[in-house]
């Protein structure tokens, strides 16, 4: 089938990258990457691309967080010196994620060390290769995702759940990220971009794309099953497309009619407005419950609603992180054998597969482009909930 072909193609190149986040790991992995200032190099040309060779010092533009809750400062800092085992990536485009806003606000339990450069959806080409790097070369097209590196030898890393590693380092949080002209990366954790995928469309796949794709995978649904996507925003509109490409019948749930109309054009067969309809009753009436529900909405009410939408033996996957907690009706869960799962971004293999769906035209983010100089205005719009889809910075 088409979904199988996409996955099999990427598994043939499974040394490429992905990443993820566990909030619990924030307190255990606070090592920093290189500081903001570095020694730098002169430019030369390879295959029509500007890269860096040995020579005089150079500067790069970056958006820097100096104080939590204050505007980012657009300034010139030194281009990083490349240590052994790492690569320097020339950033062409960088997606803006709500996690970047949380990092800049410092409103998560463990905060980044100041100052730092946010951004974990940077895409570009390898500008310089550190000593000992064997499988990447200058000019290679890559993405630098959230998961900067892990220990590689704990039970989670060895068991295919590297996103749960207690020693993980995170791009744009514990190490400097992609809101800059250049960013350092671990070559084992970058995502190799398929040739058919342009830079700007690839950027949102590094976080939003792989997050919803992994969330759908852990539902353990099969082609032909009914899957509901709760929340059709920056993540949800991509989830509808991934679900359709994976062979599922898709239900879209939101509180905004315009987002539901978009979901319909993206392949949703049933759309429901949670503000005006009894979503649980409608899903049970139409299909006797969904086999899986992916919750991207940052809403505790959506979590409870998702459980009610499930078919017997159904699974709900949670990727949204609203504050607080939600009640779990034990009687319903036990008697109907329902499963509740959290899902944390995705592994390197998950990212590889997510990018391939994009390369084959099965998934495309709805995004607008902007300049790094406008990052504070973008964050203001994000706080106000005025951003549709995603924003990609053109560097």
Predicted regions: what they are:
Residues 16-17:
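Cysteine-centered motifs
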Residues 35-55:
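Short, Lys/Arg-enriched N-terminal segments with co-localized hydrophobic residues
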Residues 50-123, 185, 394:
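Short N-terminal strand-loop motif that marks the start
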Residues 52, 57-58, 257, 304-308, ...:
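C-terminal hydrophobic helical "lid"/dimerization subdomain
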Residues 80-94, 107-155, 189, 194-200:
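Glycine-rich beta-strand-centered segment in the early N-terminal region that forms part
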Residues 111, 149-230, 265:
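NAD(P)H dinucleotide-binding glycine-rich loop of Rossmann-like/cofactor-binding domains
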Residues 142, 195-282:
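Mid-domain Rossmann-like dinucleotide-binding core that forms the NAD(H)/NADP(H) cofactor-binding site
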Residues 219, 251, 255-257, 261-339:
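Glycine-rich cofactor phosphate-binding loops and adjacent beta1-alpha1 units
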């Amino acid at each position: 089938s088409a979904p199988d072909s996409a996955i099999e193609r990427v598994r043939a190149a499974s040394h490429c990258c992905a990443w993820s986040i566990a909030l619990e790991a924030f307190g255990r992995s606070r090592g920093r990457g290189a500081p903001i200032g570095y020694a730098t190099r002169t430019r030369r040309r390879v295959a029509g691309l500007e890269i860096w060779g040995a020579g005089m010092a150079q500067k790069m533009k970056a958006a820097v967080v100096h104080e939590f809750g204050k505007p980012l400062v657009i300034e010139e800092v030194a281009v990083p010196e490349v240590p052994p085992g790492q690569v320097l990536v020339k950033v062409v485009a960088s997606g803006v994620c709500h996690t970047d806003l949380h990092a800049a606000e410092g409103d998560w339990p463990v905060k980044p060390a100041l100052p730092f450069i946010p951004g974990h959806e940077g895409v570009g080409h390898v500008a310089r290769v550190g000593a000992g790097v064997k499988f990447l070369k200058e000019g290679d097209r890559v993405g630098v995702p959230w998961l900067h590196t892990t220990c590689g030898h704990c039970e989670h890393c060895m068991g295919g759940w590297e996103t749960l590693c207690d020693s993980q380092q995170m791009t744009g949080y514990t190490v400097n990220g992609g809101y800059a002209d250049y960013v350092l990366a671990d070559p084992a954790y970058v995502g190799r971009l398929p040739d058919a995928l342009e830079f700007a469309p690839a950027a949102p796949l590094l976080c939003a794309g792989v997050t919803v794709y992994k969330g759908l995978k852990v539902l353990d649904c099969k082609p032909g099953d009914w899957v509901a996507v709760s929340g059709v925003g920056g993540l949800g509109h991509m989830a509808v497309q991934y679900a359709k490409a994976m062979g599922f019948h898709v239900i879209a749930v939101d509180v905004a009619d315009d987002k539901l109309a978009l979901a319909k054009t993206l392949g949703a067969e049933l759309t429901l407005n949670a503000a005006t309809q009894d979503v649980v009753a409608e899903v049970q009436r139409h299909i006797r419950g969904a086999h899986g529900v992916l919750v991207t909405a940052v809403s505790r009410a959506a979590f409870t609603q998702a459980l009610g939408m499930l078919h017997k033996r159904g699974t709900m996957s949670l990727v949204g992180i609203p504050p607080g907690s939600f009640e779990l009706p034990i009687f319903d869960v036990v008697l109907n054998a329902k499963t509740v799962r959290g899902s944390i971004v995705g592994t390197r293999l998950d990212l590889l597969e997510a990018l391939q769906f994009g390369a084959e035209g099965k998934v495309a983010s709805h995004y607008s482009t902007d300049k790094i100089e406008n990052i504070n205005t973008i964050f203001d719009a994000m706080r106000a909930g005025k951003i549709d889809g995603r924003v990609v910075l053109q560097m």
